[in-house]
Swiss-Prot record:
Stretches for region Disordered: 1-75
Cellular localisation: Cell membrane
Name of the protein: Uncharacterized protein Rv2560
GO cellular component term of the entry, any: plasma membrane
Amino acid sequence: MSQPPEHPGNPADPQGGNQGAGSYPPPGYGAPPPPPGYGPPPGTYLPPGYNAPPPPPGYGPPPGPPPPGYPTHLQSSGFSVGDAISWSWNRFTQNAVTLVVPVLAYAVALAAVIGATAGLVVALSDRATTAYTNTSGVSSESVDITMTPAAGIVMFLGYIALFALVLYMHAGILTGCLDIADGKPVTIATFFRPRNLGLVLVTGLLIVAVTFIGGLLCVIPGLIFGFVAQFAVAFAVDRSTSPIDSVKASIETVGSNIGGSVLSWLAQLTAVLVGELLCFVGMLIGIPVAALIHVYTYRKLSGGQVVEAVRPAPPVGWPPGPQLA
């Protein structure tokens, strides 16, 4: 009778296949790997030189902890205008005085610049008074003011001062709101120490120039550019980018989520308008809330992060247990 053929590399067992229990396989002979998802039986160990099978494809070791210094309290990068409003109001209530006082101070400074400029322009202009008497004998007067070269120079300088103050205020408020978004402690002085002020001034000049040119060609292009460049100053303050790169980054950010940008802009406008309806006193709340919405939108749409809103602390003490009858 013929014997079955022997497989190469698997010589016939000289002992008839009867091996003692617990003996190791011959040298060079690897034990068949266990089925996927199973390991060695409990209480056993692998012989020397025998490696455990690799994990199934598509699986790897469990992820380790984040590297030291990585912030674990940050939110995901998704954007929702509802979350923006909720987060901004929460952050405002946690920093109300710190936000309101700088806005009030900037408002007083703006009013002082406008009032001083207007007063000097009127004082340096030529005035001509003309008296009229109608057929009923009622007299009236009209005053014609003609601006002199000196008054024109004062008005020009006043516009420059007002523009610089607005940009300074914008950069200062953004600096404080960005620190709030990072979870850093802020004080009233934080809002008067804007970062990258030189980049902010040049970026603001670039935006105004392009918007003005677009307005001369047609009003709509200027408005569109002003809308897509709304985050340029935030990029300059937060990431120290050049004016041109700040504008480009803002255009890309708005273009990546036009719907979210529009809703955020409408939310900011609503906050300011509601403040105006409350006899302008409400703007002390509306402007900071709008700035926080702006910062939240900028961070989320540009791939940045913000700290989570502060949740109210749970009540002190153990919760009451079930009441027995």
